[in-house]
Design a protein with these regions (language model features):
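Phosphate-binding P-loop
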Residues: 28-29, 37-43, 121-124
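Walker A/P-loop
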Residues: 47-80, 91
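Conserved AAA+/SF3 P-loop NTPase catalytic/coupling segment centered on the Walker-B
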Residues: 114-116, 121-149, 180, 186-187
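A short helix-turn-beta junction within AAA+ P-loop NTPase domains corresponding to the substrate/partner-engaging
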Residues: 69-71, 183-188
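Short glycine-rich substrate-engagement loop in P-loop NTPases that contacts/grips substrate
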Residues: 86, 91-124
Length: 188
């Protein structure tokens, strides 16, 4: 997702921005540091691919630690849908509550559970959002998140509101190379 920049190119863009240099418990290579800092500077997702157990998830944790940020982790499974990262609407509970005469039924927002992207978008401070093992999901999963990750916003159809990132999160996406990711996703 991010093409590494040279140290000189990255240095010009860093200014007073956050800069990851590793942590006392994690020594990052120069190439890895450049890739992370390019993603931070350009405010673009960083895709980390590699075999299981090679430290992809740990990198995200160390980036959060090194930059003094909270980390939100969205673990992807074969059944995960992109919509779950945004929000889930519980229509069944709302129907049940309407039959029971519950007052809360009048506000549809009472039946919306915020996903990890929504939580990251509304965080008061910048956070690191880890989307872990994206290749475990359906082949269309990554493409289903393209617009949300590009624009850092999404529409909640049930309430009519648009959720926009208050502070653009640092998005780190990991892949175990179990499946090929869509070209459109990789180009971004």
């Amino acid at each position: 997702m991010i093409n590494p920049l040279s140290s000189a190119q990255l240095g010009k863009n860093m200014g007073k921005r956050m800069k990851f240099t590793g942590t006392k418990n994690y020594v990052a290579t120069e190439d890895l540091t450049i890739a992370v800092n390019a993603a931070v500077t350009l405010e673009r997702p960083l895709l980390i691919k590699g075999e299981p157990g090679t430290g992809k998830t740990e990198l995200a944790k160390q980036v959060a630690s090194g930059l003094g940020l909270e980390m939100l982790e969205w673990n992807i499974k074969s059944t995960t849908k992109a919509q779950q990262g945004l929000y889930e609407y519980d229509a069944v509970s709302r129907l049940r509550d309407s039959q029971l005469g519950e007052e809360r039924v009048h506000d549809v927002a009472n039946y919306i559970r915020k996903g990890k992207l929504w939580q990251a978008f509304e965080a008061d401070k910048k956070v690191v959002l880890l989307i872990d093992e994206v290749d475990k999901a359906d082949i269309e999963f990554p493409n289903d998140l393209l617009q949300e990750l590009d624009k850092m916003e999404f529409h909640v159809y049930e309430t009519g509101e648009t959720v926009r990132a208050i502070n653009r999160p640092i998005v780190i996406i990991t892949s175990n190379n179990e499946k090929e990711l869509p070209d459109a996703f990789l180009r971004r």
